[in-house]
């Protein structure tokens, strides 16, 4: 029994905690939704305007419900949409997405005007191929080739 298991006994899969979403701020919500839904193929789960807080949120996922893991796109109304985006600081790295056809996906994204930062390549012979792209707000997204040979992306 691992040390973590001694402290975290959750029982069945349904009782286990799960990562639900990660939030990023975007300068233009419509532009971000075009990128994540039209170009990456994610599903729009919900979109809500919160007038009291002066912001809008949208949840996108490759699944069909919130529990499949999502990205929350948040637009603060007082942030000028003519700015390129928010400062990401030095702490944010990237979001990683498993892609069955990495080369084909990168070709489609590039044809759609998406910036490819790192073309598909393997960092180690035993690791899956990966690529990096940038979303419209400058966030890095790692695309990892998924297959039966590499069941855990990134390892």
Map each language-model feature to its residues.
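Vicinal oxygen chelate
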Residues: 1-15, 56-59, 97, 103-155
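Short N-terminal helix-initiation segments at or just after the protein's N-terminus
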Residues: 2-9, 20-23, 34-45, 76-83, ...
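Short, low-complexity disordered segments enriched in Ser/Pro/Gly and basic
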Residues: 13-16, 88-90
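Core segments of cupin and vicinal oxygen chelate
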Residues: 14-17, 23-68, 111
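Eukaryotic phosphotyrosine signaling hubs
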Residues: 19-21, 90-95
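Residue-level signal for secondary-structure boundary sites
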Residues: 30, 68, 81, 103-105, ...
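Conserved short beta-strand elements that form part of the metal-binding/catalytic scaffold
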Residues: 43-87, 133-136, 140-147
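Short, electropositive, low-hydrophobicity segments enriched in small/polar residues
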Residues: 67, 93-100
């Amino acid at each position: 029994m691992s040390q973590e298991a001694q402290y975290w006994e959750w029982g069945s899969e349904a009782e286990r905690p799960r990562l639900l979403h990660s939030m990023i701020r975007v300068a233009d919500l419509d532009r971000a939704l075009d990128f994540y839904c039209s170009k990456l193929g994610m599903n729009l789960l919900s979109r809500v305007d919160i007038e009291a807080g002066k912001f809008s949120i949208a949840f996108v996922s490759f699944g069909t419900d919130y529990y499949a893991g999502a990205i929350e796109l948040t637009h603060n109304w007082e942030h000028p949409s003519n700015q390129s985006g928010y400062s990401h600081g030095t702490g944010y790295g990237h979001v990683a997405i498993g892609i069955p056809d990495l080369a084909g996906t990168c070709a489609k994204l590039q044809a759609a005007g998406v910036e490819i930062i790192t073309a598909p390549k393997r960092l180690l012979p035993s690791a899956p191929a990966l690529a990096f792209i940038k979303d419209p707000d400058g966030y890095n997204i790692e695309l990892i080739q998924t297959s039966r040979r590499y069941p855990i992306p990134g390892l």
